Amino acid sequence: MSDNDSRFLHTLGRIADALESRNPPDPDPAALPPADAYVWNRARRRMMLVENINRVELRLLCGIEQQRDTLLSNTIAFVRGFAANNALLWGARGTGKSSLVKAIHGTVTTRGMDCALVEIHREDIEDLPFIMSFLAGLDRRFIVFTDDLTFDHGDSSYKSLKAALDGGIEGRPDNVIFYATSNRRHLMPRQMIENERSTAINPSEGVEESVSLSDRFGLWIGFHSIDQETFLDIVESYVTFFDIDTSKVDIRREALAWSVERGARSGRVAWQYIVDLAERTETNISNK
């Protein structure tokens, strides 16, 4: 082989490598290593293993007992092979929506039920139909989860979500369920819905397509602002769980002042106070 031929083949190889890096092949379901959780990496077209899931125990989520029972019952039915609904957890930020999804997954796995959690980021939602199809080829159950799911004006990716939830003529895979959290009950701002009404050939059909997106979820689970006593119950449950020494601290007064300073009472604000309290009392809360 001449030097020119060698250089030509080398150049072709580099071009092929570059094309593959930009357009990686679809993953092989059989090659997916076992794990409790994965995150979809769109750039690499593969599932990335999650070694340590960032979650709290289910019993620490106070003030959302009804929401907890509803989603837990639905999840257990799904994992056991019975009929179950896709779920939309909607409401104010910091009220425990995503924490509940992760805590319930942890609960069912500790009970010996084999189920993996797969997170797909909001910006990758167009890959949801492919992910559903990919997971359908595996002999395992999966909760596919997207946090903070909303669609703004001009964003047409919601159509991919509708297609995935409807499942086409094949239907939704029996071994996959989809949970999403959002601060919008209908996933879209009112202005976007009104804009579709004004530009549609048949205004009622345009609005119906937008609003009906949330109808693809069989469960709508609302999360609302909590009162003062519930907020304090959340704080005290963390204090007890982490065994924080509060002998020199008036936690009720401090926690309320913390919430006033941040202008909100929520599970997230309660946790932020606990992190601050643990630091001041030199309590390790990272390994619990």
Residue ranges of predicted features:
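Pre-Walker A adenine-sensing motif
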Residues: 66-80
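Conserved catalytic/switch belt of AAA+ P-loop NTPases
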Residues: 109-110, 137, 153-200
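Dynamic helix-loop-helix/coil hinge segments at AAA+ ATPase domain boundaries and subdomain interfaces
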Residues: 2-6, 46-70
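Walker A/P-loop nucleotide-binding motif
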Residues: 81-103
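AAA+/P-loop NTPase substrate/partner-engagement loops
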Residues: 107-142, 150-154
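Interdomain "pre-motor" coupling segment immediately N-terminal to P-loop NTPase/helicase cores
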Residues: 2-49
